[in-house]
C-alpha cells in the first residue's frame, strides 16, 4: 500500500479541515495526522534565529566554546531537551535531532555530518548562509523545501504505522 500526500498538499492551505479535500480510499488512519502535522511543522517561530537562540535557556557551554548557543542557533538548531538528554537540539528546517554535544563540537560540522550519515540533505545547510545573509527569495525557497520535508516525514510515519 502506497500513500502519497501530494494530492493533499495544497488542500491543507485552502481548507480549515485538512481531510475535507483529501481522499485516502476510505482507510482508517492509524494516528491523528493533523495533530502530528502540527507537531512536525511547529513551532513556526523557530524559523527565526533570534527565537532559536532564546530557546537555549540553560545551555551548558559559554560563548567562548565552539558549541555555544549562538553558533547552534545560526546553524538552524533550537533547544529541544528530552528526558534522557538536556542538550538535545533539533534543526528547524530538516527536523533532525542531535544530542550529547561536547564543548568543542562545531554545530555546522555536526549538522553536515548528520545529514550525510542519514543520507538526506538539509536545505538550510546546503544553502550555507546564516539568517542575516538570506534574501527574501531564499527564505521562501527554504520554507517551501521545509514543507516538503514535513510532508515526507509524515508520509514515512504513516507508512510505518500502516505496514505494522
Predicted regions and their residues:
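Intrinsically disordered, low-complexity linker/tail regions enriched in polar/charged residues
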Residues: 5-164
